[in-house]
């Protein structure tokens, strides 16, 4: 996707975290969609079909691991890459997240450069959806 604008869904139950991530993503030139828990994130992804989802892990109603697994198993959303964004930094959490279908895992707090690098890596490795 390179420097092209992407539609990115940010899913986080913390208003301050959501705003902080939103500011970085907007500064990188992308369009923002938001949801405040895992269940709302799944619904937003199905309705809006974003180019990518930045998903917090610890949330009410459906945690980020569960929401990621739901998106990965749904025919309409399985092509959407999910990056887990969390304070959970154990290797076991990272491995579990990747097994649920996440394409990358970034721990909070992170810099604009770190997020930009992860977004670029995920977008450059993404295959175009097949019809």
Language-model region placement:
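Short hydrophobic/Thr-rich beta-strand motif most characteristic of the beta2 strand and flanking loop
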Residues: 29-36, 44
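Short, glycine/charged-rich "phosphate-handling" switch motifs in NTP-dependent
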Residues: 103
């Amino acid at each position: 996707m390179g420097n092209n604008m992407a539609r990115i869904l940010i899913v986080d139950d913390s208003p301050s975290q959501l705003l902080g991530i939103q500011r970085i993503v907007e500064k990188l030139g992308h369009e923002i969609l938001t949801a405040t828990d895992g269940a709302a994130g799944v619904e937003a992804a199905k309705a809006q079909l974003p180019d990518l989802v930045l998903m917090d892990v610890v949330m009410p109603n459906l945690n980020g691991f569960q929401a990621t697994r739901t998106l990965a198993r749904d025919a309409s959303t399985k092509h959407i890459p999910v990056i887990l964004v969390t304070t959970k930094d154990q290797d076991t959490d990272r491995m579990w997240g990747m097994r649920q279908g996440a394409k990358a895992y970034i721990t909070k707090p992170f810099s604009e450069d770190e997020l930009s690098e992860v977004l670029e890596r995920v977008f450059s490795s993404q295959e175009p959806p097949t019809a």
